[in-house]
């Protein structure tokens, strides 16, 4: 009977892994690759869904049009063709507005939840939509300005005022911010309504806008808004990696060398620009910014480097889908803002009841 091998002999006999050998699929590198691959797949799937939503938005409505005919209307329109005129004159502008406004609201909601660490935060619940709406209503009633390219400046100022008021009242605490947003909204919405009711011309021009309709605007309306959308998008992507540190807490983020105040300031400017532009385009649409970030984190995880781009894709998917549903359920159409609110309300209730509101 042979004596058992000594520990030294066993250590010499056992092969050591080569440092040059790549980690297997169950190792850390494999896990990173698997996670990254899944996230890329989710992003690609979202892009495909957005393209499908755009195609359906162009084809569906009170008067349905085949996809082949829709494509011809885009690339080789026939003069006098009713379907082509409807697609190019009505459905293309409302689809573009739905995509841009949805992306802006999705991004603004994701940033708002990140900097407040509040799962209930979105531009509507924080009062930014109400502030932007008040600015745009003042532009229409006091100065006769209804062109979105000009009124967006008033919307930006109104959203900025609401943002400052909410953070001044809420002192940065998640629950207090939600209450402050409700207070600011309760203050600004009646003022906007009163101003509109006192000015019949402004009311007639903004009545569909006030309920979140994507109609009544043409492609030229986007011309004055793209700087706000571009600034908001660039800032959102720039601060995305910093939001991961902020999610760990202000003290941890500061210990990692991050300027917490600068991150919140840049994200705040992005939120105000995006909320102001979205409101100028499509009116005060609520709860899109609430639903989209929750869906993005569920699909792709908590890494804001991926959450932020996904929010920019899921937002237009939701808003364009809401617009399509509104066209189909009623012959005289239901505004996208109303349908989006009907979709978002159950999510708001579920989040409020199923999770701690203390923070993300």
Task: State the predicted function of each range.
Residues 1-360:
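Alpha-helical transmembrane segments in inner-membrane proteins
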């Amino acid at each position: 009977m042979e004596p058992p091998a000594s520990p030294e002999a066993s250590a010499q006999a056992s092969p050591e892994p080569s440092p040059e050998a790549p980690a297997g699929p169950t190792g850390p590198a494999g896990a990173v690759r698997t996670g990254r691959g899944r996230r890329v797949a989710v992003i690609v799937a979202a892009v495909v869904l957005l393209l499908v939503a755009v195609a359906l938005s162009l084809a569906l409505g009170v008067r349905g049009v085949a996809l082949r005919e829709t494509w011809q209307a885009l690339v080789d329109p026939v003069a006098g063709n009713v379907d082509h005129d409807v697609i190019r004159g009505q459905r293309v502008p409302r689809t573009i507005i739905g995509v841009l406004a949805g992306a802006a609201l999705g991004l603004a909601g994701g940033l708002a939840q990140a900097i407040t660490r509040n799962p209930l935060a979105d531009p509507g619940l924080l009062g930014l939509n109400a502030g932007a709406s008040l600015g745009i209503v003042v532009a229409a009633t006091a100065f006769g300005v209804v062109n979105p390219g000009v009124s967006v400046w008033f919307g930006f100022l109104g959203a900025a005022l609401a943002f400052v008021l909410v953070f001044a009242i809420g002192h940065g605490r998640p629950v207090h911010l939600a209450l402050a947003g409700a207070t600011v909204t309760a203050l600004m919405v009646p003022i906007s309504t009163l101003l509109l009711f006192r000015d019949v011309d402004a009311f007639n021009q903004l009545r569909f806008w006030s309920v979140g309709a994507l109609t009544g605007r043409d492609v030229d309306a986007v011309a004055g808004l793209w700087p706000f959308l571009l600034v908001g998008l660039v800032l959102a992507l720039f601060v995305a990696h910093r939001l991961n540190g902020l999610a760990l807490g202000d003290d941890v983020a500061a210990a990692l060398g991050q300027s917490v105040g600068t991150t919140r300031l840049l994200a705040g400017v992005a939120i105000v620009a995006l909320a102001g532009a979205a409101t100028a385009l499509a009116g005060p649409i609520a709860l899109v910014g609430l639903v989209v970030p929750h869906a993005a984190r569920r699909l792709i995880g908590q890494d804001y480097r991926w959450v932020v781009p996904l929010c920019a894709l899921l937002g237009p998917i939701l808003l364009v889908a809401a617009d399509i549903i509104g066209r189909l359920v009623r012959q005289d159409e239901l505004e996208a803002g109303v349908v989006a609110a009907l979709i978002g309300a159950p999510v708001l209730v579920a989040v409020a009841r199923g999770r701690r509101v203390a923070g993300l």
